[in-house]
Amino acid sequence: MTTASHPTEHHHAMGLSLHNTAMGVGIVFLLVGVLGFIPGITTNYGAMTFAGHESGAMLLGVFQVSILHNIVHLLFGVAGLAMARTGRMARLFLIGGGAVYLVLWIYGLIINQETGANFVPFNTADNWLHLILGVAMIGLGAWLGRDAMDETTTARRRM
């Protein structure tokens, strides 16, 4: 189904569109990045380091964060907003970003969290979140991007 808001934007039964989903994910990443710099929302704020497992700051008291970790969230958010402009780029953001988060999940599983290899830093809660984000972003990109890719293929065949 095509909407008047964007000629190539398809909405699925749940009312989701590829563009809006990528934009929403980008906004969430921006919000998380900003919240990571707010004392109170981030506990042990004074113990935050630029990077590394020594950072004692915990977003919402659960997720270990550092300045670098917060900057990564902000950059992912900016990328999501910028890439949400076209269906192809929105799909790339969701699937590619999801793949990055799955790589981070695997990395977080195999490193010793008490060493310099844990430079972002990660804790167990971060690892679970990275798995969920990776699977969700790839799933949404594949599911919502399916119609956009079908339309592109059909349009090329008509030419």
Model-derived features: where do they sit?
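Membrane-interface extramembranous regions
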Residues: 2-159
